[in-house]
Curated annotation (Swiss-Prot):
Record bears the keyword Cell membrane: yes
Localisation: Cell membrane
Species this chain originates from: Solibacter usitatus (strain Ellin6076)
Entry keyword Cell membrane: yes
Classification via PANTHER family: UPF0182 PROTEIN SLL1060 (PTHR39344:SF1)
Disulphide bridges, residue numbers: none
Ranges annotated as spanning the membrane: 17-37, 56-76, 101-121, 157-177, 210-229, 252-272, 276-296
Designated name of the protein: UPF0182 protein Acid_6445
Keywords annotated in UniProt: Cell membrane, Membrane, Transmembrane, Transmembrane helix
InterPro entries for this protein: UPF0182
Recorded GO CC terms: extracellular region; plasma membrane
Membrane topology: Multi-pass membrane protein
Family listed: Belongs to the UPF0182 family.
Pfam families membership: UPF0182
Amino acid sequence: MQRHELPPGRRSPATRITLLAILLFLLFGLRSFAGYAIEIEWWKELGQLNTWFSMLYYGIAPVAVATLVAFLALWISHARALKFAGTGLGEHKLYARISTLALLFLAWFIAAGAIDTWTVVRFAGSRGLPAAAAGWHDNIFNKPLSFYLFDLPFYSLLRSYVLAVIIFCVLLYWIAARGWQLRFRMPHLRDAQELDPAFFKLEGGLESRFLRGAAVIGLIALAVRFYLGRYEMAYNEHGSFLVGIDYVDQNIGLPLQWLVIFACLAAAAFVAMGRWFLAALMALALVVDFAAPRIVSALYVRPNEISLQRPYIETHIHATRSAFGIEQNVREVEFKAKPEAPIDVAANKPLLDNVRLWDTRAFHDTVTQIQALRPYYVFADTDVDRYTIDGQYRQVLLTPRELDLRQLPAARANWINPAFIYTHGYGVVLAPVSQITPDGLPVLFIENAPPEVKASSLKLTRPELYYGEVTHEPVFVDTAREEFNYPSGESNVTSRYEGKGGFPISSLGMRMAAAIREGEPNILLTSYLKPNSRMMIHRKVEDRLHELAGFLEWDSDPYLVITDAGRLVWMIDGYTTSEAHPYARSVDVPDIGRVNYIRNAVKATVDAYDGETHMYVFAPDDPIISAYQRLFPDLFQPSDKMPADLRRHARYPETLFRAQAEIYRTYHMLDPQSFYNKEDLWDLARHTTAQNGGAEPVTPTYVVATLPGEAKPEFLLLIPFTPRNKDNLIGLMVARCDGKSLGDMVVLQLSKQELIFGPMQIGARINQDQTISKDLTLWNQQGSQVLRGQILVLPVGNTFLYVDPIYIQATEARMPQLKKIVLAVGNRLIYADTYDQALAQLSSGAQALVTEATAPGSSTAPKAAAVAPATGDARLQSVRDHLRRYRELASQGKWSDAGKELEAIEALVK
């Protein structure tokens, strides 16, 4: 055979294709490989390389296996279609190669769309877990919670995948068979009229053994779908009073599901025998399955709903409480509050010394003005915590001083600044919550740069923050350039990194990978990188944990802790969530989404200097985290491995508490009839936000208080409730944070017969007090603005103390100063310049600034608090009765009638 030589300078087609492939790889693949190289070094830095390989495997393997299975099914379908058309793949080799690649892509498309890898991975991780691990069991189907969290989602996914493969196989078979038949006929057709339209119909192939086989498999898969649908009835919603299986589902729906399953299997048998018409009779079973439950519900259940649905409502109540962790961990206490009971200031000094006078928003604005030092320093967040300072248990506010070069665009424009020089924040501001300077500013225990620590028991040895809430760019440390540390007068103090954070970056390969990943060629060209230089990435705490354990939900509010050694360590809460808890109501959780199961399973720590990251399991009985522990054994540690100085600062997370409070306000009703009728529905208490009467729901508040039956104050997370559409207090939900009590919850249930003022009512009394209202109006008109914090509700002894700090700030400068303190106990208001003055009046019972409760809207001026003389039991009881009726009428807004009760009281005490 004669060979044809290519002219000089011309390349063969194969060479051109090879060069094009190399070019495409350089354009699209090199950056991915560079990213993988950097990520591998990051995982090695954390000591979690095995975890990364496991995640890579778990992410690829399920889709790869599903792709292979789908490809085999599609290839067989394609081959049988060609055989039906009278040809075969062996006769068309180029077509065979192209079609094989196309089928492989189609198989991947089906697998990637149908397979959720984490559903498969969680199912694999749950194998071998004890069935009773979660402590909840479905008595209708006799299934543990793990079946609904892991098994049912996996089986449902598998069913959907099989049905998708069957549908694509049938379509492929028809298209390929008819396409090749048409190709063979086209050369013999003289015009389009000779092509019979019936040729394109499917009926001609119904006798194909392949189509019958595919239909049989599809009908069996459909039977499996209805079988699994029995369990999915546990998610049926029946109005606002029931989720899960109800009377109709159990007595009509479940038996009919077996009828439909039998019909599907019978149809599969008829199709296998070629009796397609008989298989179509399956539709009758579907009609019965659709209509019968609705008829029974309308004609029999609805007229007798509460009596028939009672056991199912009870199941729903307990399932929902269990799903949100309020069935096992909540202790409900009847709190017999006495609103007018005096407060012993001396006996409650540890508690009163920790009353939070600084609202976090006001504190943030003030600290930003007096402690930011430079424009590029920001205080991103203020957190509430507790420390033992010089022997005293103190509640404090703490905020880190982080560096954010986005505040200085000019400095950021030079690549050297963010990468080598401005690498870290510096120091924190820490203040006790209840101490105020004469100027109305917070007393600071830690301030300035370098840090000035004013408490002997606190120390700060590593104030640098390389990892934080606003750190967003990679940096290089231990380089030839010194780093900016903190400002000092007109100059700056520099430093060199002395820790072990980051990974080596000095080699040519790593520098090239970093340059490609970041799109910054200067990384490859710079002379500042030394043999010991390291690169820090994923420095934002939340992003770091999402990279490390993205299968968990992470709280959006990390908080900083000062360890005994003086290091700064971030703590952040991680959650396991699901929408698969049967019989349970779902709620929307901020930053997470809609869930009906949540646990605070993990608490993570990130060293602000080194980036050292650990995850500790705090819910070992949670089946989801147990499955992840089996999958990633190197990633998690038990909670008792957390260092003691960090464990002291673990707290109950606000995100979880909000979700539980939202559920509890309805699901505190355990009686099915009360629940059905919503007889005792609660709301989150509201509070006044401005002098004009604006209101919004209160947010959970960290406080230091003493629970009934406890000997000393402790760190608590608290939220008050009111009856639906009312403002008087009906209960307080409290989560404990200290020591072995961490995670325990207490609900103080108040008497429905005793009117206890809520935050909104206290706010209304404050706004309508003539003296206070006059001051607020005056301050809002003199180039200043009044700010109000959230009114605190604190249980003290057998009564409640309400605290409302009032701040003032200039309209052109946001630096709030604490101007006044309002304390309220029962009917008394104390309005003072300082907290110490208010406590002195509370202790002495002084009346100069203590006013009587005046009905909101009343024009009566405040009077000295009246005390009923003890001149006889009958008269005293009468005073109590009138006072009780006054409170009831005041809570309902019936001020005219309430005024008459006050007049009756005045007549009795004169």
